[in-house]
């Protein structure tokens, strides 16, 4: 049994940075793009709740008034914009969110001599022997995350690599957040609220009902997320 998501425009991308935030990449016409946002909210009313958002304007050419209208439209939808990137600073006003670069405000600081130290090797995988309970968040952008228990409803697991859940997956699982398109998500019982790989996602309503409660895996084929039963 297989379920394939429709090819999605890169409306929402989740990237690994100094924070975990949704990155919105608007496309023209903006009205159609906003309708996609509305459709996502209609399917999952709490999808963006409490999540900081960054607007990447590198794919569109908006005037200052156009940017202001976009920000107002998102605010009307209770979406909190943390910052803006991909645009010239001159197009922003002091009342708009700050211009960001790589997850931080664009502030030029004088460089100071630094002592060169030998970098310690970082682990490339994380093993959790306990369940991830409702309300908990696990973030490991360096590589794979393996959970021997279950992931509760309302919990969130974010990984730079693949995610392995040896129990029920009821919360959110976001793999490949650093652009690792070959990352996968595996679980013994799929009841997820959200699955995402390199920013392409499916919500609970998008997942084939025939797969729910069964072992499954998810991966990307081009820009399409595929979910199949895990034999």
Curated annotation (Swiss-Prot):
Positions of transmembrane segments: none
Gene Ontology biological process terms from the UniProt entry: cell morphogenesis; division septum assembly; regulation of cell division; regulation of cell septum assembly
Pfam families in the cross-refs: MinC_C (PF03775), MinC_N (PF05209)
Coiled coil: none
Sorted UniProt keywords: Cell cycle, Cell division, Septation
Superkingdom, taxonomy of origin: Bacteria
PANTHER family, sorted: SEPTUM SITE-DETERMINING PROTEIN MINC
UniProt record similarity statement: Belongs to the MinC family.
Quaternary data: Interacts with MinD and FtsZ.
Role according to the record: Cell division inhibitor that blocks the formation of polar Z ring septums. Rapidly oscillates between the poles of the cell to destabilize FtsZ filaments that have formed before they mature into polar Z rings. Prevents FtsZ polymerization.
Name of this protein: Probable septum site-determining protein MinC
Species assigned in the record: Bradyrhizobium diazoefficiens (strain JCM 10833 / BCRC 13528 / IAM 13628 / NBRC 14792 / USDA 110)
């Amino acid at each position: 049994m297989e379920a394939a998501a429709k090819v999605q425009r890169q409306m929402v991308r989740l990237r690994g940075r100094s924070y975990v935030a949704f990155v919105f990449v608007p496309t023209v016409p903006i009205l159609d793009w906003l309708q996609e946002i509305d459709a996502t909210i209609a399917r999952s009313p709490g999808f963006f709740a409490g999540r900081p958002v960054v607007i990447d304007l590198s794919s569109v050419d908006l005037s200052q008034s156009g940017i202001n209208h976009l920000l107002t439209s998102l605010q009307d939808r209770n979406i909190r914009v943390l910052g803006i990137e991909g645009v010239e600073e001159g197009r922003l006003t002091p009342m708009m969110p700050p211009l960001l670069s790589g997850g931080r405000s664009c502030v030029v600081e004088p460089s100071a001599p630094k002592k060169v130290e030998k970098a310690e090797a970082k682990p490339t995988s994380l093993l959790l022997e306990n369940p991830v309970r409702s309300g908990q968040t696990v973030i490991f952008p360096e590589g794979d995350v393996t959970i021997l228990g279950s992931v509760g409803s309302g919990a969130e697991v974010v990984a730079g690599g693949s995610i392995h859940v040896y129990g029920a997956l009821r919360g959110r699982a976001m793999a490949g957040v650093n652009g690792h398109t070959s990352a996968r998500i595996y679980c013994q019982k799929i009841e997820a609220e959200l699955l995402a790989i390199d920013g392409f996602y499916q919500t609970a309503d998008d997942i084939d009902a025939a797969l729910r409660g069964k072992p499954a895996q998810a991966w990307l084929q081009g820009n399409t997320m595929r979910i199949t039963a895990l034999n």
